[in-house]
Amino acid sequence: YTQTSAMLTELKRQEEFAFLKAADSIALQQSLRDLDQSFVNFFQKRASYPTFKSKHNRFQSYRTVNQKDNIRIVGRYIKLPKLGFVKIRQSMEVGKINHVTIEYTPAGKYFAVLNVDFEPEPRPNAGGTIGIDVGIKAFYSDSNGNTVSNPRYLERSMRKLIREQRRLSRKQKDSHNRGKQRLRVARVHEKTANQRNDFLQKQSTMLVRENQTICIEDP
């Protein structure tokens, strides 16, 4: 990291790489730290060899650290280094911000993922015990005789995804219409994934809150 950080400083002095001065310097340093950690993980055989992340990838992200309150939420805006105040839709109240990751998804949306300090509230011991049998026709059945079906809206979304993917396959490669259709497919993909995650989160949260012990069949 020390060597690459010195190289970055030298590159900023060169006219060819003057654009680096326009970027958030902390974000650039975090990228170098990520690269350093990736090689550490590789040489310690905890991960595969790091791969090049092209600027043309459909998913992009960068991380920057809060220093001297340079990242903060004010009303309906978040202040980011080099970008200033950006309007947001805030999903929940947050505490002290440590760092933020800005993500750009294939569906053309931006997300600010915040790492914050907060004090978790311990929940009372539910005391219940339940057994879960995951099925194919039904999502699962439990030892209390309850059955949870797979959501129909998820099936509809999957059918729509298949239709949009077929339309994409018929578009001419590198055409403007193919680009627009690719964005439609990405948005349906994202909606389907969000629906699935929302369903799973709600079911798992309900089971954990109502039971102290959960047994599930080993597949």
Where are the language model's segments positioned?
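Nucleic-acid substrate recognition interfaces
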Residues: Y1-P219
